[in-house]
């Protein structure tokens, strides 16, 4: 699946423009290990190391749609993993919003800061 196909799938499933727009601006492949990068836009969870996964895009879109998100909001994500959802949240809340993440796996925290 390509990025455009994933975006079309999210639109067809009725997700809001702000959610689809965030997915369009954040490249999922930037948050995936090289060995699974070719599958970055498949609608499936992918391993990111240390027994953790980057969540399925559909699952993330559902989660984002259930939150009261908008420009200028503050958000805390527990279990930030590779930082992909943090990047999506940052796009949605904009430059006047604040996004914070907490991750217990030190190696993932270091990797997400690099991305």
Short names for language-model regions:
Residues 68-115:
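Conserved nucleotide-cofactor-binding alpha/beta core module
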């Amino acid at each position: 699946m390509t990025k455009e196909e994933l975006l079309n799938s999210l639109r067809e499933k009725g997700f809001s423009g702000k959610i689809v727009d965030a997915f369009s601006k954040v490249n999922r492949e930037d948050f995936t290990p090289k060995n699974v990068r070719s599958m970055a836009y498949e609608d499936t969870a992918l391993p990111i190391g240390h027994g953790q996964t980057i969540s399925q895009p559909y699952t993330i879109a559902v989660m984002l749609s259930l939150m009261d998100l908008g420009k200028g909001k503050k958000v805390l994500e527990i279990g930030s993993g590779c930082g992909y959802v943090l990047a999506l949240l940052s796009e949605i809340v904009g430059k006047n919003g604040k996004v914070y993440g907490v991750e217990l796996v030190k190696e993932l925290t270091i990797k997400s800061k690099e991305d």
